[in-house]
């Protein structure tokens, strides 16, 4: 029985992280816009933290309403111990294409998103060397990608520390095999943006 204790503790820890994730989603207003078990995305209505001009000319100012895209962790393809390989990338790409079609249809019919001109998400990868490949994959889907600004204030750095730690916990809970041999300090982030016009043009019905 004692040999099973580490596994039992790990299982309990993962269940706790999943429960915590569900609670934080509710508090943050993150919701499921699709009932498709293959949908990889959740959505929230948020406000931009930055001024940005997207590649199609769409201009977003800090404070403007935006759609916040979040991964639906329970639906993500499982990674192996080597992380996201080619097979995983193909499955993710196809899943994202289908999910973005559903997103386009949803926001065109929900009045809450009538004034939203762009959609934003934060992407985390296990090491900085993975950023170019991940960025290229998302750009093929129509996203603009951008390195986040490094916070200068201690409060910003403190926030980033906890965001990275929580992201690591989520990976441990939902994609545990992918963390073998990886170090949390090597976690890298970047932003992805897509304008409403680009989303509807590419993925609209």
Residue ranges: model-predicted function:
Residues 1-95, 106-205:
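Non-catalytic substrate-recognition and accessory regions of acyl/acetyltransferase enzymes
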Residues 98-101:
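Transmembrane helical core of 7TM receptor-like proteins
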């Amino acid at each position: 029985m004692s040999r099973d204790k580490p596994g039992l503790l790990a299982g309990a820890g993962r269940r706790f992280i999943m429960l915590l994730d569900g609670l934080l989603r509710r508090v943050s207003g993150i919701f499921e816009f699709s009932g498709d078990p293959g949908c990889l995305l959740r959505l929230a209505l948020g406000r931009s933290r930055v001024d940005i001009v997207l590649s199609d000319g769409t201009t977003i100012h800090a404070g403007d309403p935006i759609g916040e895209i979040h991964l639906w962790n329970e639906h993500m393809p499982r990674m192996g111990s080597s992380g996201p390989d080619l097979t995983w990338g193909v499955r993710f790409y196809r899943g994202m294409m289908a999910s973005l079609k559903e997103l386009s249809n949803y926001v065109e019919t929900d009045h809450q998103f009538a004034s939203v001109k762009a959609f934003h998400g934060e992407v985390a990868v296990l090491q900085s060397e993975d950023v170019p490949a991940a960025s290229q994959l998302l750009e093929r889907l129509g996203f603009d990608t951008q390195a986040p600004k490094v916070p200068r204030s201690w409060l910003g750095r403190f926030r980033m520390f906890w965001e990275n730690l929580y992201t690591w916990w989520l990976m441990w809970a939902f994609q545990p095999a992918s963390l073998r041999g990886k170090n949390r300090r090597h976690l890298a982030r970047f932003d992805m943006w897509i304008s409403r016009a680009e989303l509807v043009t590419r993925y609209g019905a």
